[in-house]
Every structure is written in structure tokens, then in C-alpha cells.
Regions:
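C-terminal beta-rich recognition modules with glycine/proline-rich loops and embedded aromatic residues
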Residues: 27, 72-84, 88, 92-208, ...
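Surface-exposed beta-strand/loop patches in extracellular or lumenal glycoproteins
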Residues: 213-228
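Well-ordered alpha-helical scaffold segments within catalytic/enzyme domains
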Residues: 6-20, 55-68, 212-216
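Hydrophobic, small-residue-rich alpha-helical packing segments that form membrane-like cores
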Residues: 1-5
Length: 338
């Protein structure tokens, strides 16, 4: 499945470089077909989302920048939920009994290649020698080959390719986060981020609030309005002073912003529930397996309400208000706080 995504993404890239309208239209059609097998939160039929999502994110960027900015919405959901949540943050997530199950049993492949011992009292990384017990510590921060509904660390599920593709997804979003224009800059994603143009601070999913602090006087700032922001109730305020702001299409345009000015975009952020189709590959064909109800706040998944595994992923425990200062996002200067 990942190979299909890779080839298709290159087709879109070629169409964009050659200005081939027919090829681009065909590429868009393929993208929409492939993404129809992916849940709104980014779970893929092949359950290898770190890789497949990265290619879909890349192709969606081509579409967002050329034909339809609404594709930024899809990118945001995939990165915010699947890519970020596949990170292996703590070795406490490793479950020995599940790791034991995830082995080659007879002729059946279950997660793990190779000839491993009958028990996993000793981790199967014997080439680390005396440091074998330290493997889990060294693995923290990597990314898992994992479905969104579970988060189990078994041998071979934490892979270099998963980590590399996840980091590439983050890089693509960071690269497109703030884009310079002749009059100022555009903001396409709504994360906490900082570069030479501005500092961005997101309060989601706790509060409908997004703040920008320009690094210099800026004639025009355009901020993309996600589908879940109510344009009629969107308010823009600044401290100190005032700014001119109006809605133009799917962007709010802010003019004459001053260096160091805190510009706040305020909007209602309500919970809602969707029902997502979950596909799996059967003889290399995506087949509908089940439906799952998903609770969202904005573009952030708060809970999966159905079909969690025996070892459900530790979804958003790190997003509790106890994990941030005073109910506000932690500011990490010069870095992205996902």
C-alpha cells in the first residue's frame, strides 16, 4: 500500500512541475480515492500510517497549494492525531505479554520476524550484549508501526523507517506553517511554532484560541480558517493597540500588525462525534472491517468510542490540563509543541 502512495505522490509532483492539467486532475482523483480508505484521523488499511500518511500529506500539500486549500484540513487531522500519537513516549507502554504474543507462531506471521526465544524475559536484541535491558530506554522518542486504536511495543514494531517518515511529516508541516508573501506572511496550520516571522501559540484542544506575535511590523497576515472555526463567531483582538481584520474566503486577513503585538483569534470549540469507516487489506484489496465512533474537539481526537484493542493506545493523556502550565500550552521557543 505504501508503494502505491509513493508512486502516486510522485505523479502529482510531476504534474505540478510540468503544468499538466490532465495529469493533475487524474492525480487528484487518485488521492481522493486512496484517502477514502483512510479514517478522518489517519488510520490506513495497511496499518503502516507513519509511511503512508507521509506520502498522503505530501500529495495533499500539492493539492492545497494549487487547487484547494481545504486539503490543509486533511493534513492537519493526520499529523495531529495519527502521526503525533504514534510516538513511543515511555517504556511503560511496552507490555511483555503482548510482546510474547507478537512472534512468529508456526507458519503465521504476528508482528515479528525472526527466531526469538520462547519467552521474552530477555529482550531479543542480543547484539546489545549487557545493554540489552536498556533498549526500551533508548527507544523512547521513536515512532511505532501501529494502528491508532492501539499502542503496543513489541519487537520490530518500533522501526527506523516509521520514525523517519514521521519526522518528515513534521518537517513538511513546519515548512508550510508560516509562508512569506510580498506583504507579510500566510499561516496555514495552527500549532505552537516559532520562526523568524512570528511566534504562534495554539490553545487547542482546551480552548478555542490561537495567538500570533509578529517579529516585525507586518503589512498583511493571512490566517487560514479551518472548517471547524465558525466564521460568524470568530473574533480578532490585539494587545497592545488594534489591528484591522476581515474575512476573505477561507482566510482572515489582518493588516498593519506591529512587532511584538499579541494578536488573538477567538472562536467556539465544541465537541462532536463522527462515525469512521475502518478498512483493512484483504488479499491486497481494502475491505471495510468495522465502524468506529470518534469524539473530536476541533481537529483533535479526544477518544475512540468503539473497537479499541486489549491494549488501547494512551490517547491524549499527555493533553490533560495537569500537563500544561496554568491551562495554557507550554511555550518551547523555536520548537514545535504538537
Amino acid at each position: 500500500m505504501y508503494g502505491v502512495f509513493t508512486v502516486y505522490q510522485e505523479v502529482l509532483r510531476a504534474a505540478r512541475l510540468t503544468q499538466d492539467a490532465a495529469l493533475f486532475a487524474r492525480g487528484k482523483q487518485i488521492h481522493d480515492r486512496l484517502s477514502s480508505y483512510v479514517t478522518g484521523y489517519g488510520a490506513t488499511p495497511c496499518t503502516e500510517p507513519a509511511c503512508s500518511n507521509m506520502e498522503l500529506i505530501y500529495s495533499a500539500i500539492h493539492l492545497a497549494e494549487t487547487v484547494d486549500p481545504s486539503y490543509y484540513e486533511q493534513i492537519d487531522r493526520y499529523v495531529r492525531n495519527q502521526t503525533t500519537e504514534a510516538q513511543f513516549r515511555t517504556k511503560n507502554e511496552w507490555k511483555r505479554e503482548l510482546a510474547h504474543e507478537g512472534r512468529m507462531t508456526g507458519g503465521e506471521f504476528r508482528w515479528v520476524f525472526g527466531e526469538y526465544p520462547d519467552t521474552l524475559d530477555i529482550l531479543p536484541y542480543d547484539y546489545y550484549g549487557e545493554d540489552a535491558d536498556d533498549v526500551l530506554d533508548k527507544s523512547e522518542g521513536g515512532f511505532l508501526w501501529t494502528d491508532f486504536s492501539e499502542h503496543r511495543f513489541v519487537p520490530a514494531s518500533l522501526m527506523l523507517c516509521c520514525s523517519g517518515h514521521a519526522m518528515r511529516s513534521f518537517h513538511l508541516v513546519a515548512e508550510k506553517m508560516i509562508r512569506p508573501t510580498i506583504r507579510g506572511f500566510d499561516v496555514n496550520f495552527h500549532y505552537s511554532f516559532e520562526n523568524e516571522y512570528a511566534e504562534l501559540i495554539s490553545y487547542e484542544p482546551f480552548e478555542g484560541k490561537f495567538m500570533m506575535i509578529p517579529k516585525k511590523d507586518t503589512q498583511e497576515i493571512r490566517v487560514r480558517i479551518p472548517a471547524y472555526w465558525d466564521k460568524e463567531q470568530l473574533r480578532v483582538c490585539a494587545e497592545p493597540g488594534e489591528v484591522q481584520a476581515k474575512t476573505e474566503g477561507n482566510y482572515v486577513v489582518i493588516r498593519n500588525a506591529e512587532k511584538g503585538q499579541e494578536i488573538q483569534l477567538l472562536y467556539p470549540l465544541e465537541s462532536h462525534i463522527t462515525e469512521e469507516n475502518v478498512f483493512r487489506l484483504v488479499d491486497q484489496v481494502p475491505c471495510l472491517q468495522f465502524k468506529v465512533r470518534v469524539e473530536w474537539r476541533g481537529n483533535t481526537v479526544m477518544r475512540l468510542l468503539d473497537h479499541c484493542s486489549d491494549n488501547p493506545k494512551m490517547i491524549y493523556k499527555h493533553r490533560s490540563k495537569d500537563a500544561i502550565y496554568g491551562g495554557k500550552p507550554m511555550k518551547i521557543s523555536g520548537r514545535i509543541h504538537w
